[in-house]
Amino acid sequence: MGLLSVLTLVLTVPIWRRTPITGTGLSFAGLGQAGGLRLLALALLNSLPVAITSTLFLFFVEDRLQLPDKAGPLLILFFLSAGASVPLWAKLSNRIGPKQTLLIAMPLSIAGFIGAASLSAGNLAGFAVICLASGAALGADMVVLPAMFSVVLTRAGLNASAAFGIWSFARKLGLALAAFFTLPLLERSGFTPGQTNSAQALTTLNLAYAVLPCILKVGAFGMVLTLPTEVTRK
């Protein structure tokens, strides 16, 4: 995650050089009226798939795909794809709008989850392609959703610093929820990392890593579909 943070910082320097808008005091009522709470709910739901896969990535690669010592290179590939895609998604968002950009990016992630669920053990090339696609999709989440939230705050004249503190909390909550629900689920199935596991345990891992995030991502995609286009444009 540190590598991804550095890449994001470097690639989004022009965005953070803009003059900050402090706005007026922040309240949940004000956020709700501006549409900010809706975007916060979307951010939380949309953070869950990547939070789950981040939590279970090592288990999936080494135990489900049986690719020991390949998790590190695959994770780097995922991060590089995410970081490299950020400026491309930013340009596309400026051209066609944030909502339409997300509607293009999210199916990439959904396709990646479907592909991961159907991979056979030892399929390194197939999972590498999935890491590239899902990393690129994450790049859109990193740049487009915060930009949409910023537009809402600016139009409503709300305090950006306080609001983005709540935004950051929502994403961290997603990570906590991912670990809270998936790790006990694997434990109950009898899954043990680095050991010979039963078919049931590996199926549970497959469902937790690929199928559940896919369902959550489809839900987030549905939420994006309901967003008014005019609200998401600068």
For each feature predicted by the language model, list its residue ranges.
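Helix-to-loop junctions at the C-terminal end of transmembrane segments
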Residues: A84-P98
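Intracellular loop-helix junctions on the cytosolic face of multi-pass helical membrane proteins
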Residues: M1-L58, E62-L67, L205-K234
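Residue-level signature of mid-helix packing/kink "hotspots" within the transmembrane helices
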Residues: F79-P87, A176
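Cytoplasmic membrane-interface "Motif A"-like loop-to-helix N-cap segments
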Residues: N94-L108, A156-G157
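Loop-to-transmembrane helix entry
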Residues: F57, D63-S81, G126, Q200-A208
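C-terminal ends and interior cores of transmembrane alpha-helices
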Residues: P107-G122
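Hydrophobic core of transmembrane alpha-helices in multi-pass small-molecule transporters
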Residues: A125-M142, M148
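Loop-to-transmembrane helix entry/capping segments in MFS-fold secondary transporters
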Residues: P68-D69, R155-A170
